[in-house]
Amino acid sequence: MRNFIVFILFLNIAIGEDKILGNFFKDCNTSGTFIVFDGKNYASNDFQRAKQTFSPASTFKIFNALIALDNGVVRDTKEIFYHYKGEKVFLPSWKQDASLSSAIKRSQVPAFKELARKIGLKTMQEGLNKLSYGNTKISKIDTFWLDNSLQISAKNQADLLFKLSQNSLPFSKKSQEEVKEIILFKEDKIQKIYAKTGFNDNINLAWIVGFVKTENKILSFALNVDIKDIKNIKIREELLNKYLANFSNNNRIKSFY
């Protein structure tokens, strides 16, 4: 994500399937989908796959945080809700206490598992139902977004993220604004970019979802891609950049660095 090239949408997206876009996945010797939504129209390289559901992996952290905030499980994004107790964890950066703000930046899985347990099954299920988040299925409360029980499509992701950008999800405006603050990836005088990545090593699938906001335009996006080797995880950022650049080349968006 650190080398993420960002783009501005300034024209409406035409509904359609662009075969040229699809070549980017082929060029990387993999399969996947990219879909964008401007609030009215969609564009995708593969609408069929864009409607196919997969585990959201760490992209669900966006909505895990939203449900927690809206239900008062945490007061705000700065409250320390997770305390590291010396247990074995996957990454060194996870060996520390966490707030929502710090945990989402580190994609700190143990912290979000603890958050889900604090939310509880009943409240979490109510949250998923309110969102119409994928198949809304919960298996075990602290693994359901990782173990393939919860499934969501790229189109559904793009829809939800566009609603989040507008504060139009069925949650308080305050909670939605707080969540957007912690997924803000980059900003300048022209635009703000909000994004979250995810990777499911059970099915070797990587995600990038988010939205771009300018003074008078918003574009949400979702990309998922099959990753044969975790060493090639950067493919997802490369693909996203190529897709957005393609819109730029077609005078749909303007790029900047």
Predicted regions and their residues:
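Mid-domain, small-residue-enriched loop/turn segments at the edges of structured enzyme/sensor domains
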Residues: 92, 99-100, 112-161
